[in-house]
């Protein structure tokens, strides 16, 4: 449900107010005050609605209303207030005693707006029209930074690879398993070990051989020397299958020389 009308529009006058109607409205308000605008027209003997009576009184019949044209000071004040408040005419009228909001709005559209345009000022924004933009547009690009980072990464990687290659060249390669025998032979591993030990003892290279007391005195090839016996025993012991002498007795499992 909407708001009920203030009066019956079928029995109200419309259009311009007559001088007689203005005098009745002024006389009633002076005698009784403004009061309720809904009941005022009937009490004052006016065939008008309450809204029409209120607007006629506020905008035209009030005794404190200023008559005549706007002054230059009022024009500058209206321009300043409009730049701060915009089109809020009722607030602007509150700062101008004796002037109504409707009067100020009409005066703005007919006079002040044209005055601002003649000065080259936009009436809406209150700025100079066709003013070059003073704002500097700064663009931030990350492309150069990314390229510099890529170049740094490539240079660091190249330096690291160069250092790694220099370390590989300068450092000798160490065998992880120096005692590992990779020779391919059919003979048993014990015989290979005995051959290597015999070769080291005969050539003198390799590990230190055991010297008896007679040899330590400088009497080599003496009967009391036990080094020759040890060597012959080692040689004979290494040839336990008779592969060197090619003489193997399967009955006694003893080797003999031809």
Swiss-Prot record:
Main location: nucleus
Induction: Circadian-regulation with peak levels occurring at the end of the light period in flowers.
Effect of deleting the gene: Increased expression of C4H1 and C4H2. Higher levels of floral volatile benzenoid/phenylpropanoid (FVBP) compounds derived from p-coumaric acid (isoeugenol and eugenol).
Disulfide bonds: none
Keywords: DNA-binding, Nucleus, Repeat, Repressor, Transcription, Transcription regulation
HTH myb-type domain location: 9-61, 62-116
Database matches in Pfam families: Myb_DNA-binding
An MF annotation (GO) of this entry: transcription cis-regulatory region binding
Cell compartments where the protein resides: Nucleus
Record's GO cellular component terms: nucleus
Tissue note: Mostly expressed in petal limbs, petal tubes, anthers and stigmas, and, to a lower extent, in stems. Barely detected in roots, sepals and leaves.
Organism domain of life: Eukaryota
The keyword Kinase belongs to this UniProt entry's keyword annotation: no
GO process annotations (BP): green leaf volatile biosynthetic process; negative regulation of DNA-templated transcription
DNA-binding region: 37-61, 89-112
Task of the protein: Negative regulators of floral scent production by repressing the expression of C4H1 and C4H2, components of the floral volatile benzenoid/phenylpropanoid (FVBP) biosynthetic pathway.
Protein name in the entry: MYB-like transcription factor 4
Gene that encodes it: MYB4
